Amino acid sequence: MAASWSPLVTLRSAARSRLTGRGVGCGARVIAIFPPAPGPRKPLWKAYTVQTLEGVRPTAASEAHSRALAVCHGPLAHYDFLIKAQELKNDEHQRRVVQCLQKLQEDLKGYNIEEGGLFSKLFSRNKPPKGLYVYGDVGTGKTMVMDMFYEYVEVKSKRRVHFHGFMLDVHKRIHRLKQSLPKRKVGFMAKSYDPIAPIAEEISQEASLLCFDEFQVTDIADAMILKQLFENLFKNGVVVVATSNRPPEDLYKNGLQRANFVPFIAVLKEYCNTVQLDSGVDYRKRELTPAGKLYYLTSEADVGTVMDKLFDELAQKQNDLTSPRILKVQGRELRLNKACGTVADCTFEELCERPLGASDYLELSKNFDTVIIRNIPQFSLAKRTQVRRFITLIDNFYDFKVRIICSASVPISSLFVYQHQDSESDQSRVLMDDLGLSQDSAGLSMFTGEEEIFSFQRTLSRLTEMQTEQYWIEGDRSRK
């Protein structure tokens, strides 16, 4: 066996491993996210769409799922098949949600949004069924059961997207639409123009079913348009299925100008049934076969040399030279100091100390299947900006199945230390002054750090799963 620092020998024999589900008991990850293929211009948001593993050589990790697809006709039968095959453990909380999704799958058979204007859709006899909003703690299987549903639902056009990526695309569409408007003539008042309705119509023409993973609202720009956007989508006949860590009532909790967001909650509950999936088990943290050693402490001897060797071994499999890499992101340049083919060697400072955002991390995820992240510090609310960037980075890497090798100052379980931050800290006072907020606003989540603490629980759970053999198999783009 190779030296203990190398995960690659473990991975070479990983195809012989038995499927244990997405974090054992949480089911197989039955789909993967790929970067969009080059070709004619497609809707921007398809870059975030999850697609099935078509044309990929099957491995032991996908055999049970493939057998289930061959004989089952719905998510409930698929779930029972995996339990009988001992790939999942029966979880009554999961089963209850799968039963709801089974009913929705049956109700949606043959459903399609009718052509015509909004008026004709409102009075159509082909009324869409209510969607489903599934919420619960991290690692309980929400994504797995939604993915089972997505595999079987029979509608003409459907899309499965990460909610953060979807909203990023919506803002791009808004910008593009505004840019296409005629320029205002000097001396003339510009007419107000609302781009939300036409964008909702555009999306409705592309999909009659939207499945959202990780439905969460942390950005005020998203919060202010959600009611109008989704009201238009629902009235156009779009059916929504979503997973979230929060119940609808807690979305954007303590957010800035939340009073303007609250009406969206009523809209969501009018068009979606709500069901909780909370078995009290984080299946990602159960015993799984590790993919070798992928997480190092910076205090370990020669850790820098070890990670250099890991990069060199990975780079040898690339048909490329090691050099700096420049990525184009929305007209900007994102420079990485060291990359080879689809492997990048980065420091935490490169990725999270610079002013980068979701669009940058999305571009990284599409260009690299393996990323080394060196010198991750221990986080606290004193470094809130870096915390948010790291959460967004890991969310994007996880969704695209990017494989990571890390060095950090502390173990995963200790990465975040909560220290109560006085709302009267210098940083908070400056921000409140800049926003023109009174002391009464000190309880907002942007000052208490509540949203970061909540989201980091998901990050820790995902980091744990990203160390497993199964995750590394699924992230191997050379098989695709």
Curated annotation (Swiss-Prot):
Name of the featured protein: AFG1-like ATPase
Source species, domain of life: Eukaryota
Keywords: ATP-binding, Hydrolase, Membrane, Mitochondrion, Nucleotide-binding
Keyword Nucleotide-binding part of the UniProt annotation: yes
Enzyme Commission number(s): 3.6.-.-
Subunit structure: Found in several complexes of 140-500 kDa. Interacts with YME1L1. Interacts with COX4I1. Interacts with COX5A. Interacts with TP53; mediates mitochondrial translocation of TP53 in response to genotoxic stress such as mitomycin C treatment.
Keyword Nucleotide-binding among record annotations: yes
Gene3D superfamilies: P-loop containing nucleotide triphosphate hydrolases (3.40.50.300)
Gene: Afg1l
The organism's taxonomic lineage, starting at the top: Eukaryota, Metazoa, Chordata, Craniata, Vertebrata
